[in-house]
């Protein structure tokens, strides 16, 4: 092996060792993605819902394109309700488990419970309706005005 290759390998190893002591940032979006995967029995990743229809993703408005999009509309409303309670739903982390019957919340504070419930209801909603690929990165945004 060439010395340059050894240096690169050493650099990668040192980086990984250093990063292992840094805890990952617990972001609600990451948790929501795992809840989605749990609810649909790991058939579809959570990021497939990040830019779906008119409501899945940031800034939802207009007429939902299908039932999955209506799930996102309801999730947006749930987050609005959480904000009215003084919660910060996009930043609130919570404890949950992925059980045989899907995800469920096991958390302590009022905001954690409320936000986790918003996410579990949305994840279960997604799992109960067919996913239509034509609405992923939906191009007919006129309908979303």
From Swiss-Prot:
Expressed by the venom gland. Keywords: Calcium, Disulfide bond, Hydrolase, Lipid degradation, Lipid metabolism, Metal-binding, Neurotoxin, Presynaptic neurotoxin, Secreted, Signal, Toxin. Its EC number is 3.1.1.4. It catalyses: a 1,2-diacyl-sn-glycero-3-phosphocholine + H2O = a 1-acyl-sn-glycero-3-phosphocholine + a fatty acid + H(+). Coiled coil: none annotated. GO terms for cellular component: extracellular region. CDD domains: PLA2c (cd00125). Residues 1-19 form the signal peptide. It is found in: Secreted. One of its GO terms (molecular function) is calcium-dependent phospholipase A2 activity. GO terms for biological process: arachidonate secretion; lipid catabolic process; phospholipid metabolic process. Its cofactor is Ca(2+). PROSITE patterns: PA2_ASP, PA2_HIS. Ca(2+) binds at residues 55, 57, 59, 76. Its main location: secreted. It comes from the Eukaryota. Heterohexamer. 2 forms exist: 2 A or 2 B chains, 2 C chains and 2 covalently-linked D chains, and 1 A or 1 B, 1 C, 2 covalently-linked D chains and 2 differentially glycosylated covalently-linked D chains. Textilotoxin was originally described as pentameric. Belongs to the phospholipase A2 family. Group I subfamily. D49 sub-subfamily. This is Basic phospholipase A2 textilotoxin A chain. The lineage of its organism: Eukaryota, Metazoa, Chordata, Craniata, Vertebrata.
């Amino acid at each position: 092996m060439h010395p340059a290759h050894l240096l690169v390998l050493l650099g990668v190893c040192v980086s990984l060792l250093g990063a292992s002591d840094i805890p990952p940032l617990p972001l609600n979006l990451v948790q929501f993605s795992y809840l989605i995967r749990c609810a649909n029995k790991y058939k579809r990743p959570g990021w497939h819902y990040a830019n779906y229809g008119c409501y899945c993703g940031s800034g939802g408005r207009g007429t939902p394109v299908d039932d999955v999009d209506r799930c996102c509309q309801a999730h947006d409303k749930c987050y609005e309700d959480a904000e009215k309670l003084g919660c910060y739903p996009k930043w609130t982390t919570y404890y949950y488990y992925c059980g045989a019957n899907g995800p469920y919340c096991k958390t302590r504070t009022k905001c954690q419970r409320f936000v986790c419930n918003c996410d579990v209801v949305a994840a279960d909603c997604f799992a109960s309706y067919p996913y239509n690929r034509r609405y992923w990165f939906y191009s007919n945004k006129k309908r979303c005005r």
